[in-house]
Amino acid sequence: MINQSMAALGNNRSTIRELFEYGNSRAAVVGRENVFDFSIGNPNVPAPDAVRRAILEETAGDPVALHGYTSAQGAADVRRTLADDLNRRFGTDYTGDCLYLTAGAAAALSCAFQAIACPGDEFIVLAPYFPEYKMFIESGAGAKCVVVPPAVQDFQIDFAALAQALNARTKAIVINSPNNPSGAVYSEQTIRRLAGLLAEKEEQYGHP
């Protein structure tokens, strides 16, 4: 017997993936240059040359160590470099020990949700949202996913709806800007208003 909730997820293929496969099938017929695929965020420009050079330098090193395990937190020198970059740009005082590297954003979100979720917690996502958020929250972290609709005229945050959704069980709000899939970028005014609302709710409920 397998987990029925996971089986249900597997029985419903992602609409995004369906569109992606349709784009591939059309490209095989009419040519890739004639298909404009907006289904998946694949890059349409090459990586910076510095990235290419760095990859080549890594592959030219010890061929055995290249394919070995790193620290569970990620390579120490990379974490130190990232901490230095954050400190330089934002005036922070991070060290490499403050950072944890993952293989992509999905793994980072999943780990973070599981790390902070407790029984009965709720996570708020702002629609439209990346569908896997719901799976990370409910199946991965065992929490409740609460969806707040956007202000449809500009896809900024509907603060009346958000304020209504916030309660003592709210553990986190997932903020994604530029938004996936709408592409909307939250304005400075939106971010400041969000910070004010959260400060108000923190005082009301006695916790972040």
Please name every model-derived segment.
Residues 2, 6-104, 111:
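N-terminal small-domain helix-loop-helix segment of the aminotransferase-like
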Residues 63-207:
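Conserved core of the PLP fold type I
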